Amino acid sequence: MLPMITGFMNYGQQTLRAARYIGQGFMITLSHTNRLPVTIQYPYEKLITSERFRGRIHFEFDKCIACEVCVRVCPIDLPVVDWKLETNIRKKRLLNYSIDFGICIFCGNCVEYCPTNCLSMTEEYEFSTYDRHELNYNQIALGRLPMSVIDDYTIRTIWNSPQTKNGVNPLI
């Protein structure tokens, strides 16, 4: 008789514990009902990236001294640096610089270790192409100024929305 009573007590305790867990989950679900949705409609709306976002690499040809530090610190030896030694001034002259973003892992080592700061990470992240060879950027493509996400039309429309003006930030 005693084992049967303890079995019923254990069953009752387990039932109460399960009901409490279900209630906790339901309360979490209810607490999310008054929040704004986090999902955005990507092609039409874009999130503002953080300051430390690692996007497309921007390259300034005039600052580069062809030291090849970026190639040495890259885990996959990605940047291709072509240079020629100028014998009259005994310095390297940069001929060509290219990065294939189809292979790049966006680790940021090249930007961090560059002694002349000719490399920087931008907030550009849209690299969609139909041909993977278009992802190989030379110094001209790397040197073009990136379009800032904040200047994008969709960001400006979200920022000027009535929800933002009422003190509710739709991006958070």
Swiss-Prot record:
Keyword Transcription: no
Residues noted as binding [4Fe-4S] cluster 1 in the record, renumbered to the chain: C64, C67, C70, C114
Cofactor binding mode and count: Binds 2 [4Fe-4S] clusters per subunit.
E.C. number(s) listed in UniProt: 7.1.1.-
Family per similarity comment: Belongs to the complex I 23 kDa subunit family.
Gene Ontology, cellular component aspect: chloroplast; chloroplast thylakoid membrane; plastid
Main localization, broad class: plastid
Listed cofactors: [4Fe-4S] cluster
Source species, domain of life: Eukaryota
Binding site for [4Fe-4S] cluster 2: C74, C104, C107, C110
4Fe-4S ferredoxin-type domain mapped to chain residues: 55-84, 95-124
Catalytic activity: a plastoquinone + NADH + (n+1) H(+)(in) = a plastoquinol + NAD(+) + n H(+)(out); a plastoquinone + NADPH + (n+1) H(+)(in) = a plastoquinol + NADP(+) + n H(+)(out)
Top-level enzyme category: translocase
NCBIfam families in the cross-refs: ndhI (TIGR00403), NuoI (TIGR01971), PRK05888.1-3 (NF004537)
Primary role: NDH shuttles electrons from NAD(P)H:plastoquinone, via FMN and iron-sulfur (Fe-S) centers, to quinones in the photosynthetic chain and possibly in a chloroplast respiratory chain. The immediate electron acceptor for the enzyme in this species is believed to be plastoquinone. Couples the redox reaction to proton translocation, and thus conserves the redox energy in a proton gradient.
Family annotation (Pfam families): Fer4_9
Protein name (database record): NAD(P)H-quinone oxidoreductase subunit I, chloroplastic
GO MF annotation terms: 4 iron, 4 sulfur cluster binding; iron ion binding; NADH dehydrogenase (ubiquinone) activity; NADPH dehydrogenase activity; quinone binding
Assembly and interaction partners: NDH is composed of at least 16 different subunits, 5 of which are encoded in the nucleus.
Bilayer topology annotation: Peripheral membrane protein
UniProt record, GO biological process: photosynthesis; photosynthesis, light reaction
